A protein has these predicted regions:
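P-loop NTPase catalytic phosphate-binding loop
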Residues: 2-6, 14, 19-138, 151-237, ...
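Active-site nucleophile elbow and catalytic-triad environment of alpha/beta-hydrolase enzymes
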Residues: 141
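Conserved helix/coil segment N-terminal to the catalytic DExD/H
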Residues: 144-149
Length: 277
């Protein structure tokens, strides 16, 4: 008889820059973001409009922050401030400071400021739905087709650590997040929420049910993986960008290696954007 032994392969570094110069990214006209590369060499991207909202889970060292940088940089390379605005909630106040002077970005590190931002986005969501209703438009895309000279921009909210926000901001945080997650997609407001603590107390049932796209990096336990992805497997990943990616509408995840981007590369991209704004 034969004995089969599964040997983990060494992970080859995937660079974000290579994904951003790829023709698939360059030729896409949506709000396209680079996710990672599969073992067969295929590159995976997703449009925030199709993703709706994204939940990213991963313990320290899993590559969670790099994934957030990849998504942010993809959007900044793709769209201008008239087309989108990125709100980055950064409780650590260090990870996303690079972007604070860009016209397309607002970085918030104070919890009170973050709660206020989420509340204001709920108000903005209601305002947009009033406009859509009064103009007979079904969603932001039909509105922007009809009023191409004065389009509605997409607002994308990145939350670096949900547990910090939930513990310090109280129930109002969950209430605002759930309202946005349930209703805001059609009017062009999206959430990208990251946590290193995928437990039911942090990623509540209502939040999870309304985050249809999931990225699970290495997590500590099977239970964490079940919260992050609705299935086991995240606990067996290798860290450093090794991920299971479950796009909106898909039943089974694909294993990818997320793109790497250095601090120098981030600074160079931001400097180039600053020059042109």
């Amino acid at each position: 008889g034969y004995v089969y032994i599964e040997v983990p392969t060494g992970t080859e570094t995937v660079f974000l820059g290579d994904m951003l110069i790829d023709n698939e990214f360059q030729s896409s006209d949506g709000f396209t973001m680079a996710i990672g590369m599969a073992v067969d060499g295929s590159k995976h991207y997703i449009d925030i409009a199709k993703a709706c909202h994204i939940l990213i889970s991963g313990m320290t060292g899993s590559g969670k922050s790099i994934v957030l940088h990849n998504l942010i940089l993809s959007l900044l390379m793709k769209k201008n401030p008239a087309q989108m605005h990125l709100y980055i909630i950064d409780p650590k106040a260090t990870e996303f400071e690079y972007y604070k002077n860009l016209a397309a970005c607002t970085v918030v590190s104070e919890v009170n400021g973050a709660v206020e931002l989420l509340k204001n986005l709920c108000i903005e969501m209601d305002r947009r739905y009033s406009i859509l209703a009064s103009t007979g438009c079904r969603d932001i895309d039909s509105y922007n087709t009809k009023f191409a000279d004065a389009p509605m921009r997409r607002d994308i909210v990145f939350i670096d650590e949900l547990s910090d926000l939930m513990s310090m901001g109280g129930k109002s945080v969950e209430g605002h997040i759930v309202r946005i997650a349930q209703k805001a997609r059609a009017c062009g407001i999206h959430l990208v929420i990251a946590t290193q603590y995928p437990v039911a107390k942090v990623v509540t049932g209502l939040i999870k049910a309304n985050m249809p796209t999931k990225i699970c990096l290495r997590v500590g336990t099977v239970t964490n993986s079940m919260v992050a992805l609705d299935m086991a497997g995240g606990e067996k990943l290798m860290g450093h960008g090794d991920m299971l990616f479950l796009p909106n509408g898909s039943l089974s995840p694909v294993r990818l290696q997320g793109g790497f981007v250095s601090e120098t590369a981030i600074n160079n991209v931001v400097a180039g954007l600053m020059k042109n704004q």
